[in-house]
Design a protein with these regions (language model features):
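Short alpha-helical elements
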Residues: 1-205
Length: 205
């Protein structure tokens, strides 16, 4: 019999399983549900195109929506990030964050999500991401590519605030020149965290 392939290790699944609140015995294996969600994230396939070795797509979607609304997926992400940091010999909490944006060319998304990034000449969507010093994602916000970095940064800082990430002793966030001025003031006022602009040609960068 072929050994099943898992996106998550047994250790990672233990962390995820400990967060699940579904008490009633399920017809489907919850790890397979979790793996199906990982497969969707990895491949970007449509729900209805999930391979048949997973649970029915409607069941997977039901659990995905339930775990999203309950905040389980976000909590699992943060717990897994902390575990990986600890395994790498670092403290679970990071004191330094890094923010940047990335525009992606897309043609099949809705008009509300699509726009033109004037600087990069890309029509599609843009992601604003805050990572820790290991490059692990703390939080991410996606929107149309024509949204200015200043507005996108506020959205991702709001996401950071909603996570109560200030409780993890985040002392500074590094950014490039597109995030100075009003954005730095917004972050300082909202979370009392300084934003340090690092020039791309800085020898220490």
């Amino acid at each position: 019999m072929t050994k099943p392939h898992y996106f998550s290790s047994n250790f990672q699944w233990q962390i995820i399983e400990s967060l699940l609140t579904f008490k009633r015995k399920s017809k489907h294996n919850l790890r397979q549900i979790s793996e199906a969600i990982c497969y969707l994230t990895k491949t970007g396939c449509q729900w209805r195109h999930l391979p048949i070795n997973y649970a029915p797509w409607g069941t997977v979607y039901w659990y995905f929506r339930k775990w999203t609304l309950e905040g389980i997926i976000e909590v699992a992400h943060q717990q897994l990030r902390k575990a990986l940091r600890k395994k790498s010999g670092k403290k679970e909490s990071t004191s330094l964050g890094i923010i940047d944006s990335h525009s992606v060319r897309m043609s099949s998304i809705s008009g509300q999500q699509r726009g033109i990034d004037g600087n990069k000449k890309i029509k599609g969507s843009k992601r604003h991401i805050i990572v820790d010093t290991m490059g692990l994602i703390i939080c991410v916000v996606a929107h149309a590519a024509n949204i200015h970095d200043s507005k996108g940064a506020k959205e991702v800082f709001d996401c950071l605030y909603d996570l109560r990430f200030d409780e993890e002793k985040l002392r500074k966030i590094l950014a490039d020149g597109g995030y100075q001025g009003e954005i730095a003031d917004y972050l300082k006022e909202k979370m009392n965290i300084p934003l340090e602009v690092v020039k791309r040609n800085d020898k220490n960068n």
